[in-house]
Swiss-Prot record:
Esterase involved in the biosynthesis of lignin. Hydrolyzes caffeoylshikimate into caffeate and shikimate. Together with 4-coumarate--CoA ligase (4CL), acts on an alternative reaction for the formation of caffeoyl-CoA and bypasses the second reaction of shikimate O-hydroxycinnamoyltransferase (HST). Also accepts 4-coumaroylshikimate as substrate, but with lower activity. According to PubMed:20345607 and PubMed:22915575, possesses monoacylglycerol O-acyltransferase, monoacylglycerol lipase and lysophospholipase activities in vitro. Disruption phenotype: Reduced height and weight of senescent plants due to reduced lignin content. This is Caffeoylshikimate esterase. The active site is at 147 (nucleophile), 268 (charge relay system), 298 (charge relay system). Interacts with ACBP2. It catalyses: 5-O-[(E)-caffeoyl]-shikimate + H2O = shikimate + (E)-caffeate + H(+). It comes from Arabidopsis thaliana. Induction: By zinc and H(2)O(2). Expressed in vasculature of roots and leaves, stems, flowers and siliques. The gene is CSE. GO terms for molecular function: 2-acylglycerol O-acyltransferase activity; caffeoyl-CoA: alcohol caffeoyl transferase activity; hydrolase activity; lysophospholipase activity. The lineage of its organism: Eukaryota, Viridiplantae, Streptophyta, Embryophyta, Tracheophyta. One of its GO terms (biological process) is response to oxidative stress. Belongs to the AB hydrolase superfamily. Monoacylglycerol lipase family. It is an enzyme of class 3 (hydrolase).
Length: 332
């Protein structure tokens, strides 16, 4: 005979499944239309695996330029990250985004990035395919990276011919790992003794980054409900590679010669504002902009209260619109 506790559990209503999208149950096409954009989804084949990709095009008006966006660690392009894509598209830009290898609906071991040059090259293959296509080849083109996607974006820039891109945009990029987020050298050394066998192990300490990234509690709930979000421990090879590649980009900031915009919040608990400050100080670009937002957390657009996110978006819009006017298209 079932106990009282078991009977209560059996009679309790089932937890409803999460909505199919961050905005709820409104059909996708209807929602995107309400935001003034047209969305399409597809897969892009590369030698390193298949990438899930999305485009966000303005419903009306002439396209000013193209923006190629990369998301952060454990995230993907199909949840709240779309808010960034849709914002730029509503300003008149054709936006293209891809789930990084090992993320979302792209191929690869979940959140394993033992070779970030390969991760960057794979997304770059898709971005350059679009960038060089007839509708877009003569338009201004910008790379955009958020958080760890900023690191991947900078690696893509280093892998590209100088004239490929009009400008770079970063939101809380990961170029410097905060001391309290750095992996233990003892752990990395111990796992290194296994000759690479431990590289894909999800065995590194987890600092629960999402709670340090999102200020707005309601948005935190929405982001935490993302079915594609990686929630396991960091993988050994990923953390080792992040240490290597953050050091690499710090040593090569001077190779950045095109216009750059970078932004950080002073209360960022995931990446530190030093990342943006160092890029701004060391980049060789004659045209560079640094924005530091007092009291804002890591996720400047997806996770801040709306009034804060609007401040950031306004600054980004003014910057990119000004660059398009200043540098124009290749045929201008």
């Amino acid at each position: 005979m079932p106990s009282e506790a078991e009977s209560s559990a059996n009679s309790a209503p089932a937890t409803p499944p999460p909505p199919p999208n961050f905005w709820g149950t409104m059909p996708e096409e209807e929602y995107y239309t309400s935001q003034g954009v047209r969305n399409s989804k597809s897969y892009f084949e590369t030698p390193n695996g298949k990438l899930f990709t999305q485009s966000f095009l303005p419903l009306d008006g002439e396209i000013k330029g193209t923006v190629y966006m990369s998301h952060g660690y454990g995230s993907d392009t199909s949840w709240m990250f779309q808010k960034i894509c849709m914002s730029f598209s509503s300003w008149g830009y054709a936006v293209f985004a891809a789930d990084l290898l090992g993320h979302g609906r792209s191929d690869g071991i979940r959140c394993y990035m033992g070779d970030m040059e390969k991760v960057a090259a794979t997304s770059l293959a898709f971005f350059k395919h679009v960038r060089c296509s007839d509708p877009y080849k003569d338009l201004p083109a910008f790379l955009f990276g958020e958080s760890m996607g900023g690191l991947v974006t900078l690696l893509m820039y280093f892998q590209s011919e100088p004239e490929t891109w009009t400008g770079l945009m970063f939101s809380a990029p990961l170029f410097v790992i905060p001391e309290d987020m750095k992996p233990s050298k003892a752990h990395l050394f111990a796992y290194g003794l296994l000759f690479g066998l431990a590289d894909t192990w999800a065995a590194m300490p987890d600092n629960k980054m999402v709670g340090k990234a999102i200020k707005d509690p309601e948005k935190l709930k929405i982001i935490a409900s993302n079915p594609q979000r990686y929630t396991g421990k960091p993988r050994v090879g990923t953390m080792r590679e992040l240490l290597r590649k953050t050091q690499y980009v710090q040593e090569n900031f001077g190779k950045v010669t095109i216009p750059v915009f970078t932004a950080h919040g002073t209360a960022d608990g995931v990446t530190c504002p030093t990342s943006s400050k160092l890029l701004y100080e060391k980049a060789s670009s004659a045209d560079k902009t640094l924005k530091i937002y007092e009291g804002m957390y890591h996720s400047l657009i997806q996770g801040e209260p709306d009034e804060n996110a609007e401040i950031v978006l306004k600054d980004m819009r003014e910057w990119i619109d000004e660059k398009v006017k200043k540098y124009g298209s290749k045929t201008a």
